[in-house]
A protein has these predicted regions:
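Conserved RecA-like helicase ATPase core segment
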Residues: 444-535, 677-681
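Conserved helicase NTPase motor core
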Residues: 127, 136, 140-153, 160-218, ...
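P-loop NTPase Walker
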Residues: 23, 33, 37, 44-52, ...
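Short glycine-/polar-rich loops that comprise or flank the Walker A/P-loop
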Residues: 210, 239-243, 458-460, 467-469, ...
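A basic/glycine-biased coupling hinge at the interface between accessory DNA-binding modules
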Residues: 143-170, 174-176, 182, 234-408
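Conserved helicase C-terminal RecA-like lobe
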Residues: 433, 558-560, 587-588, 598-663, ...
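Helicase P-loop NTPase motor core
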Residues: 213, 220-226, 492-494, 500-587, ...
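Anionic N-terminal interaction surfaces
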Residues: 1-19
Length: 684
């Protein structure tokens, strides 16, 4: 059927369209120069209007677009409209049946996902959301019309409501699921560890997100959560033992985790590995070779000897090298360098050896060619860094030569090789669940290894337990942003906070928490204590009072109670400890650097060396251009890592902490602690 404008109507209307033709499932409007096809699946409404003389048809399309036909005889316009409308409505009724079926399928999908007795992940809800939106975009009717049809209206509204409140629906489902699991598995959560898990620990264990960061403050029971998580996966049948990968950062920590797993879960089929042991396993399986880790990796003296020998050789044989090294050590490091053959000076050799060791290690950790290292350095230091790299290149070459002679690899090389094998698909990961301890210590290289494992199976979950307040190993490559920006680096997921510490009292917690959270770059989290502490639980004391303090402790400390003396550097070990065995024979006293004390605890902690200066705490920034270019960027907040080191020291104690300071040259931390209402005692 066709409708045309009258001759006069056409002339007066001056409109691009003057006729319309009804098609099988649409309408075509056209004029002398223009033609427009309107499929019914884009048509929202048809309006028939009468002007002063002629009729007018109006076709409403999406995005507020309207197509009009003017100048038609009114009677013919009415007849055409009624015929077109009946045809369109008939077509719409048929299409509504199809749309209704599609909508019901979407409701079934929602019901299936939300009805499952399992955690609903963000990834799953995003997938459902995407699937529903794709289904809506493929409907034969415009979604704006679905409210018109009785068979579509309710289903459409339910789909829209779910899409609108998708996050609250997910949270509601997971809350109900968690409560059900905590009730159903109450015995498991009571018995899986030596003490029952608290609600925050149990909720972290139950959380089924693909990428989960568990922030575990000092003494909050992170190991219990890792063990319980492994046990939970087994109890729920979500994984077999060989599908669970448990990672620790040191061999001792891995061995302790193994023992805990055997003791609590009664299985030897789950083995905790270090990242290096994992890399070794991947290389063995993926290349059928058994790489040998160089003896040099565990022999500091031999490494130092190797680097100093090569350094002396370069300086003695090449004037340019000698000149470059003299300039580096005097201008940048501000060291006193002897005249003449400075490379033969034994004191300088001893001082430089550990630096050369660290710098070669950083270059190996980077793993790229010299040009890549230089290109990745900040622009403002790139030229100078390029000169330093050229001076270091022979030492790196000597290191590689030593490895080749030994037919061995180093730790950095292990991880690089493992990543290459994974990326080439020569090793297929069997692990569905990766659990990582001390996640805050992760470096970009180790993060790349995790990413390569998860890339092979997008459903592999990452359960990362750590504490950004205790990131103290930047010199080993630890990058705090991998924890603080966890989901940007490891995909969308969740965060759980373990909110109770079983170690220290409320006063130690209050001081330590306020001290660390003055840095806005640290994640905010609660950490509550089970015991109260008085004002003196943290006390500032003059360093001259150490003997008097130990005298006093000898009067009331029980034989089984441990006293831990902590310092920023090993050479700050107090001379008083030389006589400890005879003067305080009943006291159980240990000395450690704060770095070494990580993971330790004691009844009483004495922090020594709170002074300013070259051996001060906080330590003065003494990075060379090598660290600046090859390590993660230094944070903007002053003494950020040193502040975290102080937090670690404070939180080793159960009952009391004494911070001993130099009255003549006190550490800046002393004033900060005073401002946190920490009292200064004249005597213990």
């Amino acid at each position: 059927m066709e409708l045309k404008a009258t001759t006069l109507g056409k002339r007066l209307a001056q409109h691009p369209y003057d006729r319309a033709v009804i098609l099988n499932a649409g309408i075509k409007v056209s004029g002398d120069r223009h033609e427009y096809l309107i499929p019914f699946n884009q048509l929202l409404a048809i309006h028939c209007k009468r002007g002063l003389v002629w009729g007018e048809l109006e076709f409403v399309l999406p995005d507020e677009k309207v197509v009009r036909l003017h100048g038609t005889e009114w009677g013919e316009t009415q007849r055409f409209y009624h015929h077109l409308d009946a045809h369109w409505q008939r077509w719409s009724g048929e299409m509504s049946e199809i749309a209704s079926g599609v909508l019901r399928q979407q409701l079934d999908l929602i019901a299936t996902r939300t009805g499952e007795n399992k955690w609903l992940t963000r990834e799953q809800t995003s997938g459902v959301q995407q699937q529903i939106r794709q289904a809506m975009s493929a409907l034969p009717l415009p979604v704006n019309r679905l409210e018109e049809f009785d068979n579509c209206r309710e289903a459409w509204r339910k789909c829209q409501a779910w899409l609108k409140d998708i996050e609250s629906a997910r949270l509601q489902h997971n809350q109900a699921y968690t409560e059900a699991m905590l009730t159903e598995y109450a015995d498991f959560f009571r018995q899986v560890e030596s003490s029952p898990l608290n609600p925050a620990q149990a909720r972290a264990v139950v959380n089924g997100e693909h990428s989960l960061l568990v922030l575990a403050g000092a003494g909050s029971g992170k190991t219990s959560v890792l063990v319980a998580r492994a046990g939970w996966l087994l109890a729920r049948g979500e994984a077999s033992p060989e599908q669970i990968l448990l990672l620790a950062f040191g061999r001792k920590a891995a061995e302790e985790m193994d023992e805990r797993i055997r003791e609590r879960l009664h299985t030897e089929d789950i083995t905790a590995r270090t990242f290096h042991a994992l890399a070794l396993h991947i290389i063995q399986q993926g290349s059928k070779k058994v790489p040998i880790v160089s003896k040099l990796e565990n022999d500091t003296a031999a490494r130092h000897e190797l680097f100093i020998a090569e350094w002396r050789k370069q300086c003695s044989e090449k004037k340019a090298q000698a000149k470059g090294w003299r300039q580096w050590l005097t201008e940048e490091m501000q060291w006193s360098v002897p005249e003449g053959n400075f490379w033969d000076d034994e004191k300088l050799q001893r001082r430089l050896a550990s630096r050369l060791d660290r710098w070669v290690s950083l270059m190996r950790m980077h793993g790229g060619a010299q040009a890549e290292m230089i290109a990745s350095a900040p622009e403002e230091i790139r030229d100078l860094f390029s000169k330093r790299i050229k001076l270091m290149a022979p030492l790196l070459k000597a290191w590689k030569g030593a490895l080749k002679a030994e037919n061995a690899v180093d730790f950095s090389g292990l991880i690089h090789q493992a990543i290459v094998i994974l990326e080439k698909g020569r090793f297929i990961s069997p692990w569905k669940h990766i659990l990582v301890d001390e996640f805050q210590d992760i470096s970009p290289q180790r993060a790349a290894l995790l990413a390569a494992l998860r890339k092979q199976n997008s459903q592999t979950t990452l359960f990362a337990v750590g504490d950004d307040w205790q990131v103290i190993y930047r010199f080993s490559g630890a990058q705090m942003s991998l924890t603080t920006a966890f989901h940007e680096n490891f995909g969308e997921g969740d965060r759980c906070d373990l909110d109770t510490t079983y170690r220290f009292n409320s006063r130690i917690g209050e001081v330590a928490n306020r001290f660390i959270q003055q840095n806005p770059g640290q994640l905010k989290k609660p950490l509550n204590s089970l015991t109260n502490g008085d004002e003196k639980a943290v006390t500032l004391l003059d360093e001259s009072q150490l003997d008097a303090l130990l005298d006093k402790l000898s009067g009331y400390a029980k034989p089984e109670e441990r006293i831990l003396i902590l310092a920023r550097y090993h050479h700050m070990r107090p001379a008083s400890l030389e006589k400890a065995a005879t003067r305080w024979p009943k006291l159980q006293i240990d000395f450690m650097t704060i770095h070494a004390s990580k993971g330790q605890q004691a009844d009483y902690v004495i922090i020594v060396g709170l002074q300013e200066g070259s051996d001060g705490f906080p330590a003065a920034a003494r990075e060379s251009i090598m660290e600046e270019a090859l390590l993660p960027p230094v944070e903007d907040f002053p003494d950020a890592e040193e502040r975290r080191l102080m937090y670690v020291a404070l939180t080793r104690a159960r009952h009391r902490v004494w911070a001993l300071f130099n009255k003549e040259n006190p550490s800046p931390f002393v004033e900060i602690l005073k401002n946190l209402d920490v009292p200064v005692a004249r005597k213990p």
